């Protein structure tokens, strides 16, 4: 059904190209996963270009759980342990311990503070001592095989920000409705139009990557 509802935004390849262009302009995008999986839409930003205003929008319209998608090499460099040794969650989402910038923040909760934490963690010269643990930002370690190995928002975010020419770190948060329920495709499409954000699916991105190989 998602593909039918999204047809007004172009075909799968066109949707990916539009999303890449939007990211390159510093905009956020929305990525939908499979209806038989989480059936959710995530706001997605490049960690390099995200602004305080975009973080505020993310917190306001999202679940509040702002996640930073990182690679395994970045996780090791920052010495971030996985949140649990044995992951029994449905989709094996790779949560590490939560983080906070050790400098430049107050309580760590505000949009400005959370963005400061993300910028600190994704800096090229970031060290473990630059971050306190726990905190209010949730790092997610991506599957090393990328989106072709795990069709999750974590891998999709890293894939598309990389395609846009940025470092492989994306910021994501699930969209929710005013009543606190999870936004589904019709609500997500309405939101994307109201905020003029490009929208695509993980399936679109997988097809795009496969076609490039």
From Swiss-Prot:
According to UniProt, the reaction catalysed is: D-ribulose 5-phosphate = (2S)-2-hydroxy-3-oxobutyl phosphate + formate + H(+)
EC number of this enzyme: 4.1.99.12
Question: What GO molecular function annotation could you give as one example from this UniProt entry?
Answer: 3,4-dihydroxy-2-butanone-4-phosphate synthase activity
Spell out the residues of the site Essential for catalytic activity: 136, 174
Q: Recite the UniProt cofactor note for this protein.
A: Binds 2 divalent metal cations per subunit. Magnesium or manganese.
> Mind telling me which GO cellular component terms the entry cites?
cytosol
Annotated binding of D-ribulose 5-phosphate, by residue: 37-38, 42, 150-154, 174
Q: Name one GO biological process term.
A: riboflavin biosynthetic process
- Annotated positions binding Mg(2+) 2: 38, 153
Q: Which cofactor does it need?
A: Mg(2+); Mn(2+)
Q: Which NCBIfam families match?
A: ribB
Xref: HAMAP family: RibB
Q: Kindly provide the name given to this protein in its UniProt entry.
A: 3,4-dihydroxy-2-butanone 4-phosphate synthase
List the source organism.
Buchnera aphidicola subsp. Schizaphis graminum (strain Sg)
């Amino acid at each position: 059904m998602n593909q039918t509802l999204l047809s007004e935004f172009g075909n799968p390849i066109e949707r990916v190209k539009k999303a890449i262009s939007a990211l390159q302009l510093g905009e956020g995008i929305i990525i939908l996963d499979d209806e038989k999986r989480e059936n959710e839409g995530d706001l997605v930003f490049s960690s390099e270009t995200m602004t305080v205003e975009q973080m505020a929008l993310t917190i306001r319209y999202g679940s509040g759980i702002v996640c930073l998608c990182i690679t395994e090499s970045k996780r090791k460099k920052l010495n971030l342990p996985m949140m649990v040794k044995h992951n029994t969650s449905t989709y094996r989402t790779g949560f590490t311990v939560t983080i906070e910038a050790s400098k430049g923040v107050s309580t760590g909760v505000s949009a400005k503070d959370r963005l400061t934490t993300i910028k600190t963690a994704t800096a090229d010269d970031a060290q473990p001592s630059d971050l306190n643990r726990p905190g209010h930002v949730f790092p997610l370690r991506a599957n090393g095989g990328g989106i072709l190995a795990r069709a999750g928002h974590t891998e999709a975010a890293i894939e598309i920000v990389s395609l846009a020419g940025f470092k492989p770190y994306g910021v994501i948060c699930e969209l929710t409705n005013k009543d606190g329920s999870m936004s589904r495709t019709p609500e997500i499409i309405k939101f994307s139009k109201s905020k003029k954000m490009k929208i695509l699916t993980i399936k679109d991105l997988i097809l795009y990557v496969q076609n490039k190989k």
